[in-house]
């Protein structure tokens, strides 16, 4: 059986970030290089800097896209750009959208921590193609 647990979420500090549309981005796996550059220029704290930091030819084990993203995360937390919730929580959110044929839908989601299992155990199933 899956273990589903609350966790201490991290979110943008709305006292510091007043225009959320400037710091959000699509999922990392659908962002083209040109879009990543545009998002980075939108705001110095755009989330793309954490989820899709750019590799360079000079990357090393000590300085690479992942260490730069980790350093940005630490700095944003230290500077109060991001805030961590004080206690573990489950997070529920709704996504409202209209389909191409004009129907209104709300997708409700639960965000939580799940214990990892071997894929073959089929405890947690992949999220890809769940509507097919």
Q: What does each model-found stretch correspond to?
A:
Residues 1-131:
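A cross-family signal for N-terminal binding/gating loops and helix N-caps
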């Amino acid at each position: 059986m899956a273990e589903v647990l609350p966790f201490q979420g991290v979110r943008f500090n709305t006292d510091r970030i007043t225009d959320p549309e400037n710091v959000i981005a699509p999922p990392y796996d659908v962002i083209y290089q040109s879009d990543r550059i545009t998002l980075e220029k939108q705001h110095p704290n755009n989330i793309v800097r954490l989820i899709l930091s750019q590799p360079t030819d000079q990357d090393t084990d000590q300085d690479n896209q992942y260490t730069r993203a980790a350093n940005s995360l630490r700095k944003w937390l230290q500077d109060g750009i991001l805030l961590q919730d004080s206690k573990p929580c489950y997070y529920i959110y709704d996504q409202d959208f209209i389909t191409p044929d004009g129907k209104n839908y709300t997708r409700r989601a639960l965000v939580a921590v799940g214990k990892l299992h071997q894929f073959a155990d089929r405890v947690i199933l992949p999220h890809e193609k769940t509507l097919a």
